[in-house]
Design a protein with these regions (language model features):
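Accessory, non-ATPase domains that flank or precede helicase/AAA+ motor cores in DNA-metabolism machines
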Residues: 1-112
Length: 112
């Protein structure tokens, strides 16, 4: 039986207007949940960031090749669906970037 590749959309703690898609290593397929933090490489240098999982799906990005998630930081979500919905409202109402809301909502100790 072949396993499907899982991709996740994450909010990076940077002032960027978009979510970014990462490929989940097969060994983490059963552990991933929306609202968990994942360690992901970003940029040409591959600097590691603590990003928040917003969506889980099976569709690879079309504009770039998805990098692999390095690891998961949490066993359980640290942000629930209701909070993420509120963050979406803040992004829309204040025309803010998701990363800015992420930075404002979570304490610095929860970031890399």
């Amino acid at each position: 039986m072949s396993k499907q590749t899982i991709f996740i959309d994450v909010i990076l703690p940077l002032s960027l207007p978009n979510l970014f898609t990462y490929r989940l290593p097969e060994e983490l397929n059963n552990d991933i949940q929306i609202g968990q933090r994942a360690v992901v490489p970003f940029g040409r240098g591959g600097k590691l960031y603590s990003a928040l999982v917003k969506n889980i799906h099976h569709s690879p990005p079309t504009e770039y090749e998805a990098k692999y998630v390095d690891s998961l930081l949490d066993d359980k979500p640290i942000v629930n669906q209701k909070q993420l919905k509120h963050w979406d409202w803040i992004v829309d109402y204040y025309i803010a970037n998701p990363g800015d809301v992420f930075n404002a909502a979570l304490p610095g100790a929860l970031k890399l």
